[in-house]
Amino acid sequence: TMFPAMKAVPALAGAERQPCFAPGCGFVRWDNPLPVVAAVTECVDRDGAILLARNHAWPDKMFALVTGFLERGETPEAAVAREVMEEVALEAVSVKLLGAYPFARKNEIIIGYHVQARGEIRLNEELAEYRLVRPEQLRPWPQATGLAVRDWMLARGMVVPEIAEGNLFVHADI
């Protein structure tokens, strides 16, 4: 295996680390969370509608924010603008940080942004379809990218509907 002779041992703040016990190895698997960017994408040339996308692997009517991974040497701001361009072909004209949100289930840290974007929407091969949703139709969910939606709504003084427990993806009246 990639990590031979490893076992979990107590370490910092009660977290477990997996050191290698091979003589002289010294390797420790830290299992740090992976940073992921997410975009609350406001289409400024479509009356401020919010773009939600559905991945081919997801059930019908399951839509979420555009998300993606950082590339080596890339800032999170550049990454979220690139992901919006790659996934839906929109040009980011403004990128503003909303916050960072833990997503323990996937061991990720979601870095949420409000991205104002414009252009002709064209989906890449990852996505099956998209919806443009009026901001008041959004319904935040209790984890990760849903918290970015909540914070975006609160920053605009919007009434935020009660968060639906157990819903891991965006919910909108669409």
Positions of predicted regions on the chain:
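A short coil-to-beta-strand element that immediately follows conserved catalytic motifs
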Residues: 11, 91-99
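Short loop segments at secondary-structure junctions
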Residues: 43-47, 56, 116-120, 135-137
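Active-site-adjacent beta-strand/loop module that shapes the phosphate/pyrophosphate-binding cleft
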Residues: 99-126, 131, 135, 152
